Amino acid sequence: MYILIISCTLLLLGLLLFIIDAFILKSEEIPLIKNTKNRFCILIPARDESNVIENLIMSIESQSININMKDVYVIVEDKNDKTIDICKKHNVNFYIRKKLNLKSKGYALMEIIEYLYESNNIYDTYFIFDADNILDKDYFKEMLVCYENGYDIATGYRKSTNVNKNVISTCSALTFSLINNLLNKNKQSKNRSITISGTGYYISNKIINKFKSFPFHLLTEDYELSIYLSLEKYITFYNTKAIFYDEQPLSFKESIKQRTRWCFGFLQVRKKYFKDILKHLNNKNVLGEFISITPYVLMLLSIILLYIYLILNITLYPIKYIKLIIILSLFIYFILILFTITLLYLDKNLNIKTSNKIKAILYNPIFILSYIYCITKALFSDVSWEKIEHNASKD
């Protein structure tokens, strides 16, 4: 009985925190100071990315505004990397990393920015992309409007090059749709700092110049940066008009590897900044980050305890409790189906084929539940940075 009471308490607490985070927490609007200088560079960490990087470079060349390709810097790790040949072909800079013992995207960005400062080649804005990205022709035109309006950091709208390739890529794309439409849009409407998700964003020199480097080196440097932005009250913007594309994993194994890394990185960041977050809970931005995924964790724990309660009592009334376990499982599956339908409804720009939408509605609940495995693995094993293969796969 006590297990059931604890389960219900956790569920109600989770729902309460969700309501506070989603509907109540609102920060004061910070006045914008317009930027008049907009000399920018493009940074692309690209270890062994010769399969995909040319598509990104060509999309930069094809922008609706003129881009100086000498302001593009591709970061590689080996002088024999074929990526260098593509850089030479398109007349863009390449930088070969020196500190190869430091493995993460954050360290690659640290090295190139420190190199630019040492060379006295300092920019007003630094755009950061993954090598498998492709940019809409108006991406820079739209993003520079954000910078000129005074936003310290802004991210574009992420779409997928291979969203219709299979059900795994479709469900992976829905993960970013969740970040875009249920998180960042809501945060922006309440003047709260958005969540940066890896690529397709700029960071102003107002932030970079404090360190003359890129000081975010944990496994998920993007989430670490997001927490820092909240703590320091920087002004962020989510620009739905600045569209960029990236490639999603095609196999469940690759997806698990990617998402386990995200979970491990999330835990790393929370551990590193926990004390700082507690000190700044009067800042509604930070309070929102403190709540973060806590509602979902509490609700998940509530469900796990409910399953434990049913299993422990199964010997008393086997048929009754087996039925209850089946009903609970079907109820959870149905709720996640409704959640998936909501995501598909809210984000009509994903361009998912009808057949893939049907598959995603049926499969995405399983995809979401597999995060339990990812979180468990992240908690009990040492996850390191592993390369995710990119193959320029398109629909």
Question: What is each stretch, according to the model?
Answer:
Residues 1-58:
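N-proximal low-complexity "stem/linker" segments adjacent to membrane-targeting elements
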Residues 22-29, 33-37, 275-288, 316-395:
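Juxtamembrane C-terminal module of membrane proteins
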Residues 38-41, 71, 224:
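Cell-envelope/extracellular polymer assembly enzymes that use nucleotide-activated donors
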Residues 54, 81-88, 138:
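Acidic helix N-cap motif at the loop->helix transition within catalytic regions
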Residues 58-69:
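Short, acidic, metal-binding catalytic loop of nucleotide-sugar glycosyltransferases
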Residues 76-84, 99-101, 134:
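A conserved acidic beta->alpha catalytic loop
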Residues 82, 129-146:
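Acidic donor-binding/catalytic loop of UDP-sugar-dependent glycosyltransferases
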Residues 96-98, 102-116, 139-219, 260-263, ...:
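Long helical/loop segments within the catalytic core of UDP-sugar-dependent glycosyltransferases
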